[in-house]
Amino acid sequence: MENTTNLQNNQVENISIDEAKLIEAMNKSLDEPEPPVSPLLRMKHISHLDLDGYGSTILSEILMHFYPDGAMTLETANILPNKLSAEMEETFNNIDNYDLVVITDLAVNQKLVDMINAHPKGNKVKVFDHHLCEVADLPSNFTVTEKSPIRENKLTCATELYYNFIRNDKVYSLIHNQNIRKAIAYFVECVRVYDTFEFWNTRNDSINEIDMTYFDAPRLNTLFHIMDRDEFKSYIREYLYSPNWECLTQSNGNYTWITKVLELEQNKNEKYVESAIRRMVRTPFKYTIYKDGKVHELDYEIGVIFAEKSSPVIANTTLERNTDLDFCAVVSNNQVSIYSNKPEIDVSNIAKIFGGGGHKEAAGFTIPYVNASIFNMQHFEKIIMCAGQLNEEDICTAD
């Protein structure tokens, strides 16, 4: 069945704050003898575990930094997609503790929409996501789109969608330091360039034809993976508040110690990618099917890679070097990531079979255990069928 997607780009309204109380709180915060002000905004932010997920929650932490002391409280939870329902149930059980609940970079489905709509205080929840969504009519508190609201003809990410929301906030407007504003915008763009894999498609371009985000985006992701999460968030916040905000770039040939560390780690990652690709297992499948009254011979070639950590670079390099492969599966612990560069194949259909999701070219799902036999012929019959958008009754024989 054809996968149809209705994308909504609804404008979520601004954070609701009493401006008079905000000004009063700011004045009080300048007075040392005064006790801490009561919170004007109690926020919970639920997001994914990757760079885009943490990039979004870092923006909330930045927002809190510019509130008067004690005027905003923030609770964050970075989780796997399959934990969202349980997290929302717990959140709704304590909904009176929050004025605003933000969900970012976690795929929207009908179950989530129904859960939020059914709750009497569901209007406290704002959702920002860029994955494929099949829910036809999304409420106004959902911003779901694959397209960038800021950059024409570009793909977006959750960090950018959320940034587009909070930069209209009254408190954000109080950030008068233009260097800090530029740093935040640059950080958001680096996250977008990496999460959409835009940097990969421009890696062979002339350095004069692209901006520094294409260099800094993969370095930022490397930094994300080599640092403890709290260390990473702390480092990024310091970087964003610093007057020398270009510390991640190579502008005018000025290398910093962190740039060198990232380069060394990136070289290490490149060697790991090469090692993982050499371990790829090819799995050919041939099928005879009946569809639309005709006999079709399908011949798929799949590459399976078991890796310590999943990486789109591993899969995309594999597909680029092995043009005969129809799609590539990278298995890391109990996570399976699937990629394809063939226009006729939609790997998000594959991921849905196992309760996952994603995009046409890249998707993923979680399995309870990893075993090489999981990728045998019988297991992949339904995967092959779905990759070609076939019906189960169409399969006649498997050679």
What are these regions (language model features)?
Residues E19-L22, R229-K233, N254-I258, V273:
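Short amphipathic alpha-helical segments that mediate assembly, nucleic-acid/protein binding
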Residues Y235-L264:
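Long, charge-rich alpha-helical interaction segments
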Residues L223-F224, D228-K233, E238:
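Helix-loop-helix
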